[in-house]
Amino acid sequence: MTIWVDADACPKMIKDILFRAAIRTNTNLILVANSYLTYPNSPFIRSVLVEKGYDRADHYITSHMKAKDLVITADIPLAAEVIVKQGLAMSPRGELFTANNIKQRLTLRDINEQLRSAGERTGGPSALSAKEKTNFANALDRWLVKSK
């Protein structure tokens, strides 16, 4: 199993948790981004640099991931594609996206996008809290235990 990270928007503290987990459990971790990243020297961690452009990292991830791989992303359409490909998608806040909740999340995203297009200020996500960081670490550990 492999952990894929939509790395351009992934918070540093979440990447740090992922680095430690990959090294501790000998799990492959692939960071996909359109900018250069720094990461620990480990045979289990690598990065893929994609061209700058709309959804380039997303397309790379969905074309290379396998069923049961874990994808870390806050991008709802990417999470939906991962689910279709029988992967597991998790947000940097530790929320699991599933076949049961992804349609609702896509609808909410589309509504917010329409509001922004109409000039409404919808605001972005709040900063990651300590509780959300813990939720992410716990959800990741559960996946690692199940996948081994």
From Swiss-Prot:
It holds the Pfam family DUF188. InterPro entries: UPF0178. Belongs to the UPF0178 family. This is UPF0178 protein LPC_0108.
